[in-house]
């Protein structure tokens, strides 16, 4: 047997070696940076930029997070005073410089408002027909106004009903209160110290703003956005037209832009040094998938401002816990937020256009104009793309029409030139009944079947994890990703190789891209409809996905022009088969003796074959002809000529395919894979990172696993057209990875000290019977494990009920008595009602009206709860605002009372309907039916939220001391301790 002729090595040929190497390099070169961006925060500069002092900012953060400082705590007052001192220390050099004879005109006027006057009664709104919650709040906001060069030079706010002249200013907001169980480093200490540095920056000579800048240090955000609501009563709330809200919904990492009002204001975020975020999060709020709100909804929804929400989003396991402290964050995270705030704010205050000074968006809202819906996302944390949703819609509609048309026209041209091998089973010779098999249908349905299987299996694994170990993603997100990716690639490779072994096809790539083109076309249609009808922009990546798939598919069609015409191939195949066409069978196909060379033996050398190797058993018997179409045989009686597919084509693929370009696959890979990995990869990590730990809040984790499965298919579908060319090494390794990660994900404990499970604490004291109940809410069976570790719960009857929050259960037991009344009143002699609160009820004779006076000891938060909603209420001395109605037709079931002073007495006037005037829902609620027919029953409750001193809430101290190290304790409600007294009004 002769030795085959040596072939030159082609580093980009469509053969196993180059395909495996190049695709692996491309995917790793893009996925690794995306992972790094998701996990690593850009380093802070070694030297602070001019006008900023990072060392000072970090010291401020450490001081601010030295204790819990919720609104209802003494330390909150300390933080308030400390902020005033820090603001004064920042401004003092500026004031001294301005008083000198040679004062620099670059130093702006600065006004500080310690707002201890604003208050407001409003409601949080009801859901459906449910009764609403009324709120009375007294604010302690600190407002700093830096006058801009284009601002009204007069102090217009000092005039009665004074209004500013000129263009609107810019508001930057951060709340300085924390939750009662968290130190508030990222929620929202970093926002607060960023405000202090913004004050320092814009009062530095050379940085004077063109537009006025308002820095709002608001208090009371954690208790239903109270501070932002009461800011609406300050004159400066009518001055600002745009805003930047600094928040923390996680506890470190990068600060993400996760919500904006419009395209125009979003463009200013392009000034951020390290932009990070996607419109996906904004649409999550719009569709109701994300329900946790920030001050953004007040500034935009009520005041009509246009702006941005910038917040930390991960890790959620530290959010609202004692690990939200300076120890568990970094200067790098602080700089990431601060640099973004400086860049965005500088752009907003320097803007000279009129986009934000048009007609108001609604009644009694500021004249901030109307923006357009936008699409925005970062790329590698270094660049930021932003454009109008309408632009995306127009481009999508255009591409939906043009792309199929281009493919269709190309297919027609291929057909006209007789090179359309796709969808071709055979080729007939004109004037004969002979047909040559082209095998052009091979691989037609391979792609949808294999991709369906490769997708269904990860979805099945998502169901399996949800049933067996649903919270493993809480601590092992990347183990889940590894499992999904490895099984997808292995299955796709194995099935594609099996199909290629039994039915090899040179059209595998073309068919694969055609199916991907069809699938993404359908996806783009759906996305375009949602963008047009509902303003949803989260599917922006589909446009780019479809664009890449269109170009890659077009390349597959264009490379068919390199093939021989089907008629030429068929004629040569007929001739090489040794069987003449039926119209020529009367003629001998073999040449005459004169035409034969002298040497006609088996080793004869044909003209033009001097460079060929020695003949073998498979060498063609026809001289002077290419061996491409060798060894064809007559297919029996059906008249179809078939071949053994031997020759220059790859392995046993169709013989006509040998002229296909060997390098175009690289072009196709680069047209589709990078854009998919950059956009879809970042979205996938953004989504799973922000949602991987929502299970502790009672949310089903299946949506996270399902997202991993779907995103895996989206990420690796561009690999499928080449995957049958992979060598076995990587898929085999990935199969082992799959086995290992599957076992780990099914049996590993889902929580750890670094990724703790949050449980929610509240202690309720019934002043009527003296009972004291500690409740802990969490997910089972871990909740029971935590309670079993508590000494005071040992031997008690633990009662557990379904919580109102998703999958959480609430378990209760008799707890250690709290000592929240202050040193002069705490005692161990039992619970005495008068020590905790005092109240008085005066009913108006002959009317369904009453006045309730309530005061709590050592607290500034109480509330009233009613068994049936009251029609209206009024708090003595309170302001009201028709933009925020405090009641509605469905009534008010609860009234929350907040005071800036301690031990304050609230005076609340209420009125209610008779039972026959305002029928209750027919839900059989026994508690409601127990209320007097024309009277009212309910509870007066006071709250305590300060746990900075040990032994004040021993039950909470006990939980922190004895629960496993994988448990984090967070607050369940506004108060850590709630004491209640039943009331009845006849």
Swiss-Prot record:
It comes from the Eukaryota. Glycans are attached at residues 53, 116, 119, 238, 797, 840, 948. Residues 595-620 are annotated as: Disordered. Residues 1-20, 414-447, 499-509, 556-665, 724-729 are cytoplasmic. Its cofactor is Zn(2+). Zn(2+) 2 binds at residues 187, 222, 320. GO terms for cellular component: vacuolar membrane. This is Vacuolar membrane protease. It comes from Blastomyces gilchristii (strain SLH14081).
């Amino acid at each position: 047997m002769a030795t085959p002729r040596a072939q030159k090595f082609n580093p980009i040929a469509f053969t196993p070696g180059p395909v495996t190497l190049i695709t692996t390099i491309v995917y790793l070169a893009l996925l690794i940076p995306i992972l790094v961006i998701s996990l690593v925060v850009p380093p802070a500069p070694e030297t602070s930029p001019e006008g900023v002092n990072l060392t000072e900012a970090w010291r401020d953060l450490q001081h601010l997070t030295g204790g819990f400082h919720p609104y209802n705590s003494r330390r909150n007052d300390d933080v308030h005073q400390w902020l005033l001192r820090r603001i004064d220390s920042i401004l003092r050099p500026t004031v001294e410089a301005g008083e000198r004879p040679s004062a620099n005109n670059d130093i702006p006027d600065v006004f500080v408002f310690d707002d201890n006057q604003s208050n407001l009664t409003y409601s949080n709104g009801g859901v459906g027909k449910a009764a609403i919650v009324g709120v009375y709040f007294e604010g302690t906001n600190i407002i700093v106004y830096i006058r801009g060069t284009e601002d009204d030079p007069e102090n217009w706010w000092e005039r009665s009903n004074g209004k500013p002249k000129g263009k609107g200013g810019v508001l930057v907001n951060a709340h300085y209160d924390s939750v009662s169980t968290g130190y508030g480093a990222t929620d929202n200490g970093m926002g607060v110290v960023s405000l202090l540095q913004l004050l320092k920056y814009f009062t530095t000579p050379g940085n004077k703003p063109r537009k006025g800048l308002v820095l709002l240090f608001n208090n009371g955000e954690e208790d239903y956005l109270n501070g932002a609501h009461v800011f609406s009563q300050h004159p400066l709330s009518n001055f600002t037209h745009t805003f930047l809200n600094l928040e923390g919904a996680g506890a470190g990492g990068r600060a993400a832009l996760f919500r904006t009002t419009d395209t125009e204001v979003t463009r200013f975020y392009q000034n951020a040094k390290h932009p990070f975020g996607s419109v996906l999060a904004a649409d999550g709020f719009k569709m109701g998938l994300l329900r946790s709100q920030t001050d953004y909804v007040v500034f935009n929804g009520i005041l009509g401002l246009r702006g941005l929400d910038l917040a930390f989003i991960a890790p959620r396991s530290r959010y609202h816990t004692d690990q939200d402290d300076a120890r568990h964050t970094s200067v790098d995270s602080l700089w990431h937020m601060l640099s973004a705030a400086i860049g965005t704010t500088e752009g907003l205050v320097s803007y000279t256009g009129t986009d934000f000074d048009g007609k108001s968006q609604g009644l009694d809202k500021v004249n901030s104009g109307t923006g357009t819906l936008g699409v925005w996302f970062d790329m590698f944390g270094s660049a930021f793309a932003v454009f109008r949703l309408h632009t995306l819609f127009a481009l999508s509609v255009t591409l939906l029409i043009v792309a199929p048309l281009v493919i269709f026209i190309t297919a027609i041209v291929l057909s006209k030139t007789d090179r359309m091998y796709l969808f071709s089973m055979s080729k007939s010779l004109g004037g004969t009944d002979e047909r040559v098999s082209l095998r052009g249908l091979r691989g037609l349905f391979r792609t949808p079947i294999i991709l369906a299987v490769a997708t269904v299996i990860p979805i099945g694994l998502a169901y399996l994890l949800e049933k067996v170990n649903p919270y493993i993603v809480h601590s092992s997100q990347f183990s889940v990703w590894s499992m999904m990716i490895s099984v997808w690639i292995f299955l796709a490779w194995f099935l594609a190789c099996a199909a290629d072994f039994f039915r090899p096809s040179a059209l595998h790539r073309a068919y694969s891209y055609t199916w991907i083109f069809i699938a993404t076309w359908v996806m783009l249609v759906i996305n375009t409809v949602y963008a047009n009808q509902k303003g949803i922009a989260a599917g922006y990546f589909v446009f780019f996905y479809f664009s890449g798939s269109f170009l890659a598919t077009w390349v597959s069609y264009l490379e068919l022009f390199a093939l021989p015409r089907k008629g030429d191939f068929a004629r040569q195949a007929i001739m090489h088969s040794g069987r003449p066409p039926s119209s020529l069978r009367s003629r001998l196909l073999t040449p005459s003796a004169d035409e034969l060379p002298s040497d006609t033996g088996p080793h004869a050398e044909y003209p033009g074959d001097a460079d060929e190797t020695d003949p073998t058993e498979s060498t063609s018997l026809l001289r002077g002809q290419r061996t491409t179409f060798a060894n064809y045989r007559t297919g029996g009686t059906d008249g179809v000529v078939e071949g053994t597919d031997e020759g220059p084509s790859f392995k046993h693929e169709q013989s006509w395919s040998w002229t296909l370009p060997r390098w175009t696959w690289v072009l196709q890979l680069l047209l589709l894979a990078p854009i998919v990995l950059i956009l879809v990869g970042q979205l996938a990590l953004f989504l799973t990172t922000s949602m991987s730990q929502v299970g502790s809040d009672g949310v089903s984790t299946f949506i996270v696993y399902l997202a991993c499965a779907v995103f895996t298919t989206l990420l690796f579908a561009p690999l499928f057209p080449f995957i049958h060319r992979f060598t076995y090494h990587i898929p085999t390794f990935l199969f082992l990875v799959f086995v290992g990660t599957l076992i780990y994900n099914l049996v590993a404990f889902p929580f750890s000290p670094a990724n703790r499970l949050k449980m929610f604490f509240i202690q309720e004291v019934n002043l009527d019977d003296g009972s004291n109940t500690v409740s802990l809410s969490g997910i089972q069976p871990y909740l029971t494990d935590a309670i079993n570790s508590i000494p005071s719960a040992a031997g008690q009857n633990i009662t557990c009920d379904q919580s109102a929050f998703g999958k959480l259960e609430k378990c209760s037991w008799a707890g250690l008595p709290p000592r929240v009344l202050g040193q002069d009143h705490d005692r161990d002699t039992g619970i005495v009602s008068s020590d905790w609160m005092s109240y008085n009820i005066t009913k108006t004779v002959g009317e369904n009206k009453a006045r309730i006076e309530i005061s709590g000891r050592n607290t500034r938060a109480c509330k009233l709860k009613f068994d049936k909603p009251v029609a209206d209420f009024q708090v003595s001395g309170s302001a009201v605002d028709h933009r925020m109605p405090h009641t509605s037709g469905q009534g008010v079931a609860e009234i929350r009372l907040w005071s800036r002073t301690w031990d304050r007495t609230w005076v609340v006037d209420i009125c209610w309907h008779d039972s026959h005037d305002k029928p209750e829902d027919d839900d059989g609620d026994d508690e409601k039916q127990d209320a007097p027919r024309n009277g009212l029953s309910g509870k007066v409750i006071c709250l305590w939220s300060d746990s900075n001193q040990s032994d004040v809430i021993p039950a909470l101290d006990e939980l922190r001391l004895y629960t496993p190290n994988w448990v984090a304790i967070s607050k369940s409600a506004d108060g850590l301790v709630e004491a209640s007294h039943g009331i009845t009004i006849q």
